[in-house]
Design a protein with these regions (language model features):
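Extracellular S/T/G-rich loop segment that most often corresponds to the catalytic His/Ser-adjacent loop
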Residues: 372, 393-476, 480, 522, ...
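Subtilisin-like serine protease catalytic core
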Residues: 51-64, 72-88, 93-326, 406-409, ...
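Active-site glycine-centered loops adjacent to acidic/histidine catalytic or metal-binding residues
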Residues: 69, 377-379, 459
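Solvent-exposed loop/turn segments at secondary-structure junctions
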Residues: 70-74, 116-117, 301, 320-324, ...
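Mature extracellular/periplasmic domains of secretome proteins
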Residues: 50-59, 283-285, 306-309, 325-346, ...
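C-terminal subdomain of the subtilisin-like protease fold in secreted/lumenal serine endopeptidases
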Residues: 338-340, 344-347, 358, 408-412, ...
Length: 541
C-alpha cells in the first residue's frame, strides 16, 4: 500500500491513486519479471532463471525458510508441496508429540491466537499501546514538573508519541470520511449503470448523466484511472481505501480497543514461550501467502508462479495482525523458527515504536548463535532509516538506546522497480547508507494469495522474500557457508547501477546513487551470488 500522506494529498486534489502500482497498460510486464535478467530480458530482475541454469546437475539440501507474517494458506496449490512438515508431530491428535510445547504444530505456529481456536485479526499500532501505558502517568505533567532522569526521558518520548498519534488520527478520520463518500458515490453510479463492476467500461462512464459536481469529479477520476487498469480495479482500490482508514480509526488508533485477551498469555512476561494455537492461516493470510510464494512457490509445475528458490520448505509462523506486531511475539517467532530447523527467517513487517527491544535483541542473538540468517523489510515510508526508527533492527542497544552492537546474521532490504532509470528506487521504499543493506525487486510482484489465487502486490514486504529466497538457494547448494558468509556473498554480488535515482527529501526530492543510500550500493543478483559462493567455497577447500 502506498503511504498515507500520498493518499491524503491525492484526495485533497480530487485525484485518487490506485493502491497498487500503476503501469501504462500498453506495456505488458512479465509476471515473473523479478526472476529475469537485465541483459537478456530488459528488466531489473535478479537473474534467478540464469542462476538456476548454472545450478543444474548440482546436489542440494532442503532448506527450511520461516515466514514470520500474518498467516500462510497451507492449502494453496502452488505452496502445499513446499511446506515444512514437523516430522515428529502427528496431525490432529491434540498432543504435543515432539515435546516442544506446541500442540499439533504440523506446519508452524500461531502466536496471536488462543487455545480455544480464536485469533487476533485487528490490533493497535505500537504507538497506541504505548500511549495507553504512559498516559495515566504523564497526561497531567508539565515541562516544569520535577522528574527523575528516567521519567524525563519517558515524558519526552510520550510527548512525541502524542504528536504522532494525533497526526495519524487526523489523517485516518479525514481518509475515512473522504473515501467513504467516494465509495458511496461510486455505488450510486454502479447502481444507475446497472452492470457488475467488472463489466463497466469507459463507454459506460462517457454515457453516464451526472447529477452533481461531485459525481462529475468521480466520473473524471474513474476515467483517468481506467488508463491504468479496469473500473473493477479502481472500485476495489476505493473499497480498500475505505477499509484502510476505517481500520486505522476504529482499531489501530483506538485506545479503548485491546484484543490481547484473545491470546490468553501473561503479556508482561516476556520469557513466556508457550501460548497460541496451530492455525497458521488465520483470518487474513494474503500478505504472508504472497511472501511465501515469492520465496518458494513450486517451480515449473505449470501452476501460478515460480518462487526464487527450489529445495525449500516454508515454515509458517503467524505473529503479525492487522496492526503492529508485538515484540514478545516476534521474539518467540524467531526462537520457534530457530528451534525447529529454519536456516533463513523472513520478516516482512516493521513499526516506528518499540515496547521491549531487548526481548527481540536477545532472540536475534539466539538466531545468530545457531547460524540462522534473518531477512527484514526496510519499510514503506520513503524515509531514511539512518534518521528514523524502523523496528526490529539489526542494531543492539542499551537502556539509553545507544547502539552497543550489530547482528552479523541480518540483512535489511529496500525495494526497486522494473527499469533502469531515475524511478528505479520504488517511491515508497525506505533507504539508509548504514541501515539498509541491499535492494531487491518490490514493485508489481505477482505471487500467491489465499484460495489458490494470484495477485500483484508491492512493497519492501515483497523485496525481502526475494532476498530470503536467494539466501535459501545459496544455503541449499552451499550448505557449508555460514549465515554471515551467505550475507557476505549476497552483498558482494549485487548489481551496481550507474544511474542516479529519485528519493524523497525535506525539499521534495533529490537524485542519488544507490551506494549513497545503502551499504552494498546495489540490487541483489542470484547469478552473481552463485558465482561468488562458488569462489568462497573453493577458497575453503
Amino acid at each position: 500500500m502506498i503511504g498515507t500522506n500520498k493518499f491524503l494529498c491525492y484526495l485533497a486534489l480530487g485525484i485518487l491513486p490506485t493502491l497498487g502500482f500503476s503501469q501504462d497498460k500498453t506495456s505488458k510486464t512479465p509476471e515473473n519479471w523479478y526472476n529475469l535478467d537485465f541483459q537478456k530480458d530488459g528488466y531489473m530482475g535478479i537473474s534467478t532463471e540464469k542462476a538456476q541454469e548454472l545450478l543444474k546437475g548440482k546436489k542440494a539440501k532442503s532448506v527450511i525458510v520461516a515466514v514470520l507474517d500474518g498467516g500462510v494458506d497451507i492449502q494453496h496449490e502452488d505452496l502445499k508441496d513446499v511446506l515444512w512438515t514437523n516430522p515428529k508431530e502427528i496431525p490432529g491428535n491434540g498432543k504435543d508429540d515432539d515435546g516442544n510445547g506446541y500442540i499439533d504444530d504440523v506446519h508452524g505456529w500461531n502466536f496471536i491466537g488462543g487455545k480455544d481456536g480464536k485469533n487476533v485479526d485487528q490490533d493497535n499500532l505500537e504507538v497506541t499501546r504505548l500511549i495507553r501505558i504512559y498516559e495515566p502517568k504523564y497526561i497531567s505533567v508539565l515541562p516544569s514538573t520535577p522528574l527523575s532522569e528516567k521519567e524525563r526521558r519517558e515524558f519526552v518520548a510520550y510527548q512525541k508519541m502524542i504528536t504522532d498519534y494525533t497526526t495519524k488520527m487526523e489523517e485516518a478520520s479525514f481518509g475515512k470520511v473522504n473515501y467513504g463518500g467516494l465509495k458511496t458515490e461510486l455505488d450510486g453510479i454502479v447502481k444507475t449503470i446497472g452492470k457488475d463492476v467488472k463489466d463497466i467500461t469507459k463507454a459506460d462512464l462517457d454515457a453516464y448523466q451526472t447529477t452533481s459536481d461531485r459525481q462529475k469529479m468521480v466520473i473524471r477520476v474513474a476515467k483517468k484511472e481506467l488508463d491504468n487498469g479496469s473500473f473493477e480495479k479502481f472500485y476495489n482500490d476505493v473499497s480498500d481505501g475505505v477499509k484502510y482508514f476505517t481500520d486505522q480509526a476504529d482499531f489501530h488508533l483506538n485506545k479503548e480497543f485491546d484484543p490481547r485477551g484473545i491470546v490468553g498469555d501473561n503479556y508482561e512476561d516476556a520469557s513466556e514461550r508457550i501460548y497460541g494455537n496451530n492455525d497458521v492461516k488465520g483470518p487474513d493470510a494474503e500478505h504472508g501467502t504472497h511472501v511465501a510464494g515469492i520465496i518458494g512457490a513450486k517451480r515449473n509445475n505449470n501452476k501460478g508462479v515460480n518462487g526464487v528458490a527450489d529445495n525449500v520448505q516454508i515454515m509458517a509462523v503467524r505473529l503479525v495482525p492487522n496492526g503492529d506486531e508485538r515484540d514478545k511475539d516476534v521474539a518467540n517467532g524467531i526462537r520457534y523458527a530457530v528451534d525447529n530447523g529454519a536456516k533463513v527467517i523472513n520478516m516482512s513487517f516493521g513499526k516506528g515504536y518499540v515496547y521491549n527491544k531487548k526481548t527481540v535483541d536477545d532472540a536475534v542473538k539466539y538466531a545468530e548463535s545457531k547460524d540462522v540468517l534473518l531477512v527484514h523489510a526496510a519499510g514503506n515510508d520513503a524515509q531514511d532509516n539512518d534518521k528514523e526508527k524502523n523496528y526490529p533492527t539489526k542494531y543492539f542497544t542499551d537502556s539509553l538506546d545507544a547502539v552497543v552492537g550489530e547482528a552479523k546474521n541480518w540483512i535489511t532490504v529496500g525495494a526497486t522497480g522494473l527499469k533502469q532509470d531515475s524511478d528505479l528506487l520504488a517511491e515508497f521504499s525506505n533507504y539508509g547508507y548504514r541501515s539498509v543493506d541491499v535492494f531487491a525487486p518490490g514493485v508489481k510482484i505477482n505471487s500467491t494469495i489465499p484460495e489458490s489465487k494470484y495477485k500483484e502486490n508491492q512493497g519492501t514486504s515483497m523485496a525481502a522474500p526475494v532476498v530470503a529466497g536467494l539466501a535459501a538457494m545459496i544455503r541449499a547448494y552451499y550448505p557449508t557457508l555460514t549465515a554471515e558468509q551467505v550475507k557476505e556473498v549476497i552483498m558482494k554480488s549485487v548489481t551496481k547501477v550507474d544511474q542516479k535515482v529519485k528519493v524523497k527529501s525535506e525539499s521534495g526530492s533529490k537524485r542519488v546513487y544507490l551506494d549513497e543510500i545503502s551499504v552494498s550500493g546495489g540490487i541483489v543478483n542470484a547469478y552473481k551470488a552463485i558465482e561468488e559462493a562458488n569462489k568462497l567455497v573453493s577458497k575453503k577447500k
